[in-house]
Amino acid sequence: MRASYGHANTLNVRWTIVPEAIRSTVAVMTRSPLVRRAVAPLLLLGTAVPLGAQQAPSLTDKVAAVLATAPAGTRFGLVVTDESGREIISINPDQRFIPASNTKMFTTATAFDTLSGIDQPDPAGGTGVRLERNGGGAPDVVIEGRGDARLSSAADCKVDCLAELADAVAAKTRVVGNVIGDDSWFPDERWGPGMSWNNIPTRSGTGISALTLDDNELGATVTAGALGMPPKVDLPDYYTIDNRAVTVASGETHIAFDRDVFAYVVRLTGTIALGAKPEPLRFGIDDPARFTAWRFRQLLAARGVRVTGTIGARHRPLSPADDPAIRKGAPAARPPAPEALARLTPAPLIEDLTIINKVSQNLHADLMLRRVSRLNGSGSIADGQVAVRAMLARAGVARTEFDFSDGSGMSSYNRVAPRGAVTMLRWIATQPWGAAWRATLPIGGEGGLAKRYGGTALDHKIFAKTGTLNATNALSGYMITKGGRTLTFSIFANDVPEGTSAIAAMDRAVLTVAAEN
């Protein structure tokens, strides 16, 4: 359809046959409500042709119409391929989008492709403890991390427990000096480029460290106090609270918190009503190595071990040696590791890879990128990016179709084209580990996709990684259609207006594809 505009209130239309791709682009990219109101009658007029010339809407037309119901301004990219690799839908296939947590697909695929023995216990990643003697005094205790994401200090811990290391120290000595958390296995890069500063105080932006404990989070509970007074806050003494919140007579609970980077004072604001249920909060940790030392001192004291010194952290500053470009591809130097008094053996990495994709655990994903980085590099983000690029080159993904700055998708610098994502997904399906990787994805009707596909035609028939970030929604994976076909797809929505979501339109589009195949 071509339209020529004359007077402001008249529309002179000359009808021609328009390629489907142009019509679908109009349907998807016409976001302004005013333009939509102008274009919609034209699309209807375009169908007012003799009966013999009418054509049924194509699948792309149907999907484009669904996506056009998303909030105005949303930009979509979608690629769907059949079993042979033929693209049956292609909308902005090579445009680059912020992928949000779809980034985790690329991180976990690299881990499957490069790490050996992921279905076996993981002694290489286990946390260790050693005693360091400096002169004739009591030895210092050093807890050394090697990138394990699942170390726990919970009272009910059964595997990978910090308490086991405290038992080993208590069996060796009853007096120690300083307690030091050592995360120098990786260089000190606690946040990736492009991390939003406002996320840092939260669990979503907690620091990344080779020595990680309890997901690098600290919980607190806020309970209503007397009317007009600050609420009560139950919080371990790692942080102190600047309590500016108020107990009110009624209304919904609205509690917010903030904290300066590397500070230990949390500012609490907002309101909680009399009789309201307690409000749980989760705080991020900026220095996980120090946090682990703090917690380890408590465990030692509970075992009767006297600590005469202080708690501290030992970091390895980022240096030129952590940049593979400066090393010109040479492996990173590996200084000899000190002997440990005791070392834990975490559960198989496949369990953590499942957590990363199904739960979308940011910290674990960024630690996995660094684990991959240590194979030939230093544990730096840059070395991890080299590993991801090498995997994508093997998968046949064009270099122009991606850029990554972290392993989790929290960075706003990440970019992926839908065609690149589908190319990787199809390659994964051909790998010996492809079925195991697919099993780590959320499943329709369960977990993160329970509310989105439960009770639909794709209930337990879609296996896909979700993604949500500011102004971004994403979903990529595999679906089993009404006709029993297995399709590979990737759909991104960017520039979603604040306070809205494109998820509903995306899910209807995916269901439309499944119903038509």
Question: Where are the model-predicted features located?
Answer:
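Short hydrophobic alpha-helical segments enriched in small aliphatic residues
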Residues: G6-V13
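Conserved serine DD-peptidase/penicillin-binding transpeptidase domain
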Residues: Q54-V66, D113-R399, K482, A505, ...
